[in-house]
Amino acid sequence: MISKTEDSGDPLDQDFAEVVKQTLDRWHIPGMSVAVVDGPDTWTKGYGLAQLPNTNVTPDTLFYTGSTTKAFTAAVLSLLVDDNKNYPQVQWNTPVNQLLRDDFVLSHEWDTNNITIEDILSHRTGMPRHEFAFGGDYDGHPASLRDIVRSVRYMQRSAPPRTTYQYSNLMFIVASYLIETLTGKWIGDVFREKIWRPLGMDSTYLSLEDARASGKELAQGYLYNSSLPGYEPVPLKNKPEVSGAGAAISNIKDYAKWATALLKRAPDVLSPAGYSAIWSARTVTPTHDPFITPSAYALAWNTQVYQGVEIVWHDGGIDGFGTEIALIPSLGFAVVTQANTTYSSNYAGTALVYHLIDKKLDVAPDKRFDWNKWYEDLERQMKEAVKNARQTFYPTVPSPAPPPTLPIGKYTGNYWHPAYRQLTILWDEERNLLYADRKDSTTPCQLTFIPVSREFFLVRLTVVGAEAMLPAEFRLGPDGTPSMVGILWEPSLGDEKIWLKKEGDTHFKEMYGGIVDSTAGKKRVPDTIHPIDL
């Protein structure tokens, strides 16, 4: 679809097509769709391949849009805040616990009683990501929103509320559950009723089943493997537990409609107060070049000043896909990209978004920020961090280091934490390799345990498209066998590891006290869990 007035220049011209090709080649991305909204005009176009080897991307191609879903969640909550007839109890400053009661309990009593709707939507609850704590099996059934929300009580915060920006998918899962609890409806139906249908967004879905049932072309997500080289398909998965935090599937046409409605403040979607609320800054966020003023997070939107104009934006990344949406409200201008690789789609999308913004703002070519180089440097730093992990985490270990106390195969078993759930550690005897596979979690990952010294290990954490190295430690019980394992799964907690207790160990109650029953909600997690202080 290309719609424009006669005197409008097409920003998605042949010159831009060449820039897109170079960028996709640079980042090894099969395909991308792009939309530009400029006042009354909208342009959309597809580039490259939606599915290898020969299915082209078109403006109708569906992509997972990741965390850009959060904006729909905030928008719906703004409608409930406005609706004083049906939801008089729902205001931005309403404590979430007043609405969800025992389902929403945090590790500190003050937090439980005071964290508000506004707080959970602006990443200022004090709760870090805890990205590996949810999904998978919950007592024999797949994770529900309620399961995940109730598990939050067992997760430690890393800062006092309202002091620090900490991005949290978890809190948007809480927001999704809140919407379903208040409305009595599945959040996907609420999105469709309140936002998508009024805007004519008839190609936007919140489940893979619905997207497939539509009969519309769905892009395949990929992971580029430089060692082959080649592309590995990333399995398309339905992740209902991600919900309003990042489960949307849409195409570039529909996202152009969404961007247009936001720029025009369409009265058939949100109220004037609602539009103001979702874009009003709440939390100061880290900034970097080329931004020279403080950045902030509003309600599911980032706000920054660039070249003298305010940009409101958000990105979205999920296994095999990446989306960028950026709006300049003062100019009625927006750019959206959707592509089909993990991480690199966001790198390329950002570079192309700012290429078009720079053209709109007449920024001289020699004054434009090199986003491709910035992301290449970031990738290099992450690889260096993996390479240097042993020295970073264990700088004083002698060489040669003492071997593990036990044969590697003796560290296997089922380990458990009330929030992070079960971790089954296995031994590959042929390769003498200790590992765990959490492929069914919301963030699928594999952990490989590399011995460093005695019970101290490094864990190679592999997720789709990336890897990291984390310190880990086993603790031996009185009988000389492993009783628990600690992994630095949440870096925001500093040196505090997440401790998982080995199944069947009698020290379990001593470690977790009375918080084992996830349905009881009677005790909070200790501020820190140090079974043994070294």
UniProtKB/Swiss-Prot annotation:
It comes from the Eukaryota. Pfam families: Beta-lactamase, DUF3471. It is an enzyme of class 3 (hydrolase). Keywords: Hydrolase. PANTHER family: BETA-LACTAMASE-RELATED DOMAIN-CONTAINING PROTEIN, D-ALANYL-D-ALANINE-CARBOXYPEPTIDASE/ENDOPEPTIDASE AMPH. Belongs to the peptidase S12 family. This is Unguisins hydrolase ungD'. It comes from Aspergillus campestris (strain IBT 28561). The gene is ungD'.
